[in-house]
Amino acid sequence: MAISIKGVNTGVIRKSNNFIALALKIKEPRNKESLFFMSVMELRDLLIALESRLHQKHKLDAAARLQYEQARDKVIKKMAENIPEILVDELKNADINRRVNTLELTDNQGENLTFVLTLHDGSKCELVVNELQIEMLARAIIHAINNAEMRELALRITSPLDFLPLYDVDCQQNGNLEYDTYSQPEWKHNLFDHYLAVLYRFKDESGKEQFSG
């Protein structure tokens, strides 16, 4: 059965200065609670999908944008009234089987985003996020990381959300080109509708000009 969101809470599990996981606790409409633990990569995947939908909302005309924002604010207020409690013991004795190994956006149509979470024990959970809940969910994730005084991590996982790297190339001194490719799942490709190539020039430590792209 799909998990819908009534309220969310987040907390960071860390060891010394090292980020281990983000705890994401969800209160469902019938007050059942589900707890997941997400690594940096899965958080980035989630945020990329959320940011893509927010980008669509930013392109609305003024009247539609106002209508969306008013509806969003009502939902955010309701979510704030239904924040589930995260117990210290749930963080200290985190169940590894609740760790999210992979996250996939399987439905991006309509008002809801549907994700399939594959957990450490091999089980799968379907998580449904309404577009009016996106900002509250994203805010809760970033707030938890900042609250753990890991602002560099917050910047790292939020900065590359508006593009998807596919290739890079270095121009070698002998004139050859050295390519690297980045394999991305199809659902990420589907979030973007145009491609850009960037070529830049820089000087290396010896002062020689180099080219990359």
What residue spans do the PLM features occupy?
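Extended intrinsically disordered, low-complexity coil regions enriched in Ser, Thr, Gly, Ala
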Residues: 14-21, 25-67, 113-157, 204-213
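A near-ubiquitous, low-amplitude feature marking generic local secondary-structure context
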Residues: 29, 86-88, 120, 164
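Charged surface patches that recognize polyanionic ligands
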Residues: 51-87, 160-162
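Intrinsically disordered, low-complexity charged/polar segments
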Residues: 156-169
